Amino acid sequence: LHLLSRRQRQMCIRDSNTIGRHISKMVYTKVVSNKSPWLQKAELGGVYCNPASHGEGRFVASDEWIGRLFANGQVATQYVSADGELSGDEEWNVNGSYANIEGITSPDGRVLGKMAHSERRDNGVAVNIYGEQDIRIFESGVEYFK
């Protein structure tokens, strides 16, 4: 949570998954803000399927702080169904994150933190999984920071 301000860190935490064990599966996430340079090549509203593999990582915050993060464009991605719909069901929101939050950014967008492992996708990997897998984080970042 270092990408949040000191005050935001006091109000937001990363917690253990609600199921109490390690998760390893493909998850669907929707880009809800492309304020971050890391998401400039991702489609706003686009749904991407990437591996999740973690035991900790559920995003927890008060409704007030979640509202502030959304208002500032800091909520970058949310867990969704394969159809792009928000769902509290653990099939889709695999770790029980509040407001289905999967990825957040620093206030200026230059730091991105997310749970799904975009770096684990490649051509020929998970070819039997439905959905777009390349959120183009690294391509976006390289173009912005070069």
Residue ranges and their predicted role:
Residues L1-I13:
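Single conserved hydrophobic/aromatic residue that forms the stacking wall/gate
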Residues R14-K146:
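Amide-donor transfer/coupling interface in amidating biosynthetic enzymes
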